[in-house]
From Swiss-Prot:
Enzyme's top EC category: translocase
GO molecular function: NADH dehydrogenase (ubiquinone) activity
Gene3D superfamilies: 1.10.287.3510
Protein name: NADH-ubiquinone oxidoreductase chain 4L
Organism of this sequence: Xenopus laevis
Transmembrane segments: 1-21, 48-68
Places the protein is found: Mitochondrion inner membrane
UniProt gene name: mt-nd4l
């Protein structure tokens, strides 16, 4: 495992740990998910360069359309939830009201 692969894997594990430990603020959850998605996409880009497998680079084009709408939708829902409820904590989110 090269140093670049190790740094991407450790950043993904760090995002997963942050997701497990900071479950209360919605913005923290979104940032951890976004970091994990970014590291997995970087790993998908980097793997075909070292293994000379060009077919797996197509997976990036499959994952990329989900990244930007996920971030935009999450931030807009978070700002709307903060303006209506006054907090961004996850426990104040009631799914039965939706």
């Amino acid at each position: 495992m090269t140093l670049i692969h190790f740094s991407f894997c450790s950043a993904f594990i760090l995002g997963l740990t942050g997701l497990a430990l900071n479950r209360s603020p919605i913005l923290s959850i979104l940032l951890c998910l976004e970091g994990m998605l970014l590291m997995s996409m970087d790993g998908i880009v980097l793997t075909p360069l070292h293994l000379t497998i060009y077919l797996s680079s197509m997976m990036l084009y499959i994952m990329l359309p989900f990244a930007a709408p996920e971030a935009a939708t999450g931030l807009s829902l978070n700002s709307d939830h903060y303006t209506t409820h006054g907090t961004d904590k996850l426990f104040s989110l009631n799914l039965l009201e939706c």
